[in-house]
Amino acid sequence: MRQILVLLLFVTLVYGLIRVPLKRQKSIRKTPKEKGKLSHVWTQQGIDMVQYTDSCNNDQAPSEPLINYMDVQYFGEISIGTPPQNFTVIFDTGSSNLWVPSVYCISPACAQHNRFQPQLSSTYESNGNNFSLQYGTGSLSGVIGIDSVTVEGILVQNQQFGESVSEPGSTFVDASFDGILGLGYPSIAVGGCTPVFDNMIAQNLVELPMFSVYMSRDPNSPVGGELVFGGFDASRFSGQLNWVPVTNQGYWQIQLDNIQINGEVVFCSGGCQAIVDTGTSMITGPSSDIVQLQSIIGASAANGDYEVDCTVLNKMPTMTFTINGIGYQMTPQQYTLQDDDGVCSSGFQGLDISPPAGPLWILGDVFIGQYYSVFDRGNNRVGLAPVVPYPPLMNGV
């Protein structure tokens, strides 16, 4: 009888979850790389790939390194307004604002994407404030509006969001997403906006104040994974969740004990800070460490990227990220990316984040694809466990 009750409770929790399917599509980096123009993109954005680094200076306005979004492949759908206007967004735990292009945007990138038309929504209100976000060498700017936002059937009322009227450079022209929905803490939200998930909690729209992310690394799966609001799905991971306290409530920031290569501590020997970030595609770290790491794994700069020989993956070292005393191992097959043309690229990228926020390591999609990640706002902690390979996910299952 006890086993039956436990099973019924599990089924109730699983089917009470709000699931947002994540589609896997071509990344921003993919298109210029296919055209042989990736090096030109880096030059335009002021990113010196020879030095293996991008930088983020906290003395500037709130900043998002543009390189973080270059390889993001996981996107979901939301709608804004009444009647609903649909948008494809990155669900980004590394930022806290929701923004989409405005119909009044004059940038080339906006013309290629869905744009919000406030005059068509009966529930829209103007906030009257402006906002600006720094992306690489340019800034994204616009106005703040208030409207209803729907995420997989969850109706969030009176949500503040950015309507971009100017987007930087030409990089977002090739993006598969229209905008970004931030899932970080309110302290890093620009313009005093309350993040979407905070409003979900305040409006009693979720069972528990947590959400979880599953990302499939199977390139042949048409559905990339899922974002779950209100809890987690234990069928998506093996073993138990290992909980890690959040050390700074801005990003989902945690303590990283050390980083090992083939069992030997090489980086972060005295401990360092890291963030678990669905909006960053790769694993990033201080450029001086990444230069050394790329050399260790045999990656070399080529065609605006860092490539490794696909035929020697079995000879490359194993990486282990030790977090709260638990080792999270990654094989070469897991920390490299293989293109359709058979070229393998390193899953590591240099990124210098200035104090006081940095230096930081960022555990992006390359890491999250191997470890189911739960973001618990109620207890300010992150849960991690090895993913269970799944058949293609079906919407709403």
Curated annotation (Swiss-Prot):
GO BP annotations, alphabetical order: antigen processing and presentation of exogenous peptide antigen via MHC class II; proteolysis
Domain of life of the native organism: Eukaryota
Expression (tissue specificity): Expressed predominantly in the anterior and posterior adult stomach and at much lower levels in the larval foregut.
Entry annotated with the keyword Glycoprotein: yes
Signal peptide (from-to): 1-16
Domain Peptidase A1 stretches: 74-385
Enzyme nomenclature, EC number: 3.4.23.34
Gene3D superfamilies: Acid Proteases (2.40.70.10)
Catalytic reaction(s) noted: Similar to cathepsin D, but slightly broader specificity
Disulfide-bond pairs as recorded: C105-C110, C268-C272, C310-C344
Glycan-bearing residues: N86, N130
Location(s) in or outside the cell: Endosome
Entry coiled-coil feature ranges: none
PROSITE patterns (UniProt xref): ASP_PROTEASE, PEPTIDASE_A1
Family membership noted in the UniProt record: Belongs to the peptidase A1 family.
Protein name: Cathepsin E-B
Gene, per the UniProt record: ctse-b
